[in-house]
């Protein structure tokens, strides 16, 4: 008899804002809004106190100030957030060797077979939550199910500091209980098309044929939704590469389309990946970009070249790949960036064999920035583009 699969999706609650409240106790219980502070800035993350005023991520800062004039508005400290993220991710390793980090504040844990060590999924999830709270001061919400897609949705059903378990055989009932807006992957435009066709609830969609859904949404989106409402999506979050890789991605509450916004997000993803590259003392030559449109069509593109040298190098390569693949007409729901075929970095004495003198200097400067930041735990140095984005863009 096959072992029943168990997956956790763990999401750090209001991560950036929670770190700010943790580091500044006077902010506890108050509306904290992290994001760019200029007229063009947008909200990255806000505390649950701020959400009561209607503030949400990707909202223009000016609008957030109008909704929540008493809010505490802060620029992001990405290096500090990475530090706290690493603390949480290291705790995961004490619970399972199979971890897939999908962003700075969320990850999937394959807990299959771990009941022999930690007991039932409920017991292990409660222990995980307790350990994270005690060791980092942060709270997490956990979704538990037989596949990653259901676990992802479940983690959002009892936020903050929640635990929601969907037992085997309960997937369809769980999906039918959801408001249409809570079906992961179904954005505003998709909902509009479904409602226009008379499909306003998950049970109605469940009772529709795959052919009908494809006629409304297109083949890819129709098939996706047909499987989603049945809880049968087993590969949405499967590993895209078999070899060792380091990746990050971001799903947006509101779809992206402008090139300026896309470039800003791409640079942040590149910065996050290089931070992890330096931290793990590895290198890679293959860059991959993933695009998920708001109709849930997903495309990816990759290329192999010289060893990725620094954040700017990674950003330029990723940006070139992105615009080769982007259809320039469909809003984007998710962006992902990956460095593949990772291997241990070469000894410093051999570096000059693989990098030009200019690139060696650039890489060493960025490694020094990372080392100082890690040592001091604050933004001592950072790339000029990130300084600009502290003022203007998405954190």
Curated annotation (Swiss-Prot):
Active site: 106
Domain of life: Bacteria
EC number(s) stated in the UniProt entry for this protein: 2.7.7.7
GO molecular function (one): magnesium ion binding
Site feature Substrate discrimination, where: 16
Keywords on record: Cytoplasm, DNA damage, DNA repair, DNA replication, DNA-binding, DNA-directed DNA polymerase, Magnesium, Metal-binding, Mutator protein, Nucleotidyltransferase, Transferase
Pfam families: IMS, IMS_C, IMS_HHH
Subcellular location: Cytoplasm
Record's catalysed reaction(s): DNA(n) + a 2'-deoxyribonucleoside 5'-triphosphate = DNA(n+1) + diphosphate
Cellular component terms (Gene Ontology): cytosol
Residues in UmuC domain copies: 7-187
Family the entry assigns: Belongs to the DNA polymerase type-Y family.
Quaternary structure, from the entry: Monomer.
Protein's name in the database: DNA polymerase IV
Organism annotation: Treponema denticola (strain ATCC 35405 / DSM 14222 / CIP 103919 / JCM 8153 / KCTC 15104)
Record lineage: Bacteria, Pseudomonadati, Spirochaetota, Spirochaetia, Spirochaetales
